[in-house]
Amino acid sequence: MDKKTSRLRRATRARKKIQELGVNRLVVHRTPRHTYAQVISPDSQVLAAASTAEKAVTEQLKYTGNVDAAKAVGKTVAERAIEKGVTVVAFDRSGFKYHGRVAALADAAREAGLKF
């Protein structure tokens, strides 16, 4: 089993457990160049989203594939979710380690007011 397949299996397992809870989830995806985050409802509606591919986020950054960029995405997605009335979420790290950019995004979202 290769690295990507293992990550996707971990992600599927975590998503099934979150679906059983029936709560909104903060989903994180990362590539070498960008970081993406979405708040998704239990019925699969995207309530809020942010990424380093957006012009609004990229204007503040020098480079989009680092921890500082992930912090900006976390703050932005949390602010947008709170505007929609979402304050409590489950964190879906999509099988990625809770380290580096994923952890930075989560910490920034917590500081901006999301609870998980």
From Swiss-Prot:
SS bond partners: none
GO terms for MF: 5S rRNA binding; structural constituent of ribosome
UniProt cross-references to Pfam families, sorted A to Z: Ribosomal_L18p (PF00861)
Superkingdom of source: Bacteria
Gene Ontology biological-process annotations: translation
Single GO cellular component term: cytosolic large ribosomal subunit
rRNA-binding found in the keyword field: yes
Keyword rRNA-binding: yes
Alphabetically ordered keywords of this record: Ribonucleoprotein, Ribosomal protein, RNA-binding, rRNA-binding
NCBIfam families attached to this UniProt entry: L18_bact (TIGR00060)
Function, as annotated: This is one of the proteins that bind and probably mediate the attachment of the 5S RNA into the large ribosomal subunit, where it forms part of the central protuberance.
Similarity remark: Belongs to the universal ribosomal protein uL18 family.
Self-association and partners: Part of the 50S ribosomal subunit; part of the 5S rRNA/L5/L18/L25 subcomplex. Contacts the 5S and 23S rRNAs.
PANTHER family in the cross-refs: 39S RIBOSOMAL PROTEIN L18, MITOCHONDRIAL, LARGE RIBOSOMAL SUBUNIT PROTEIN UL18M
Record's protein name: Large ribosomal subunit protein uL18
Species name: Shewanella sediminis (strain HAW-EB3)
Organismal lineage: Bacteria, Pseudomonadati, Pseudomonadota, Gammaproteobacteria, Alteromonadales
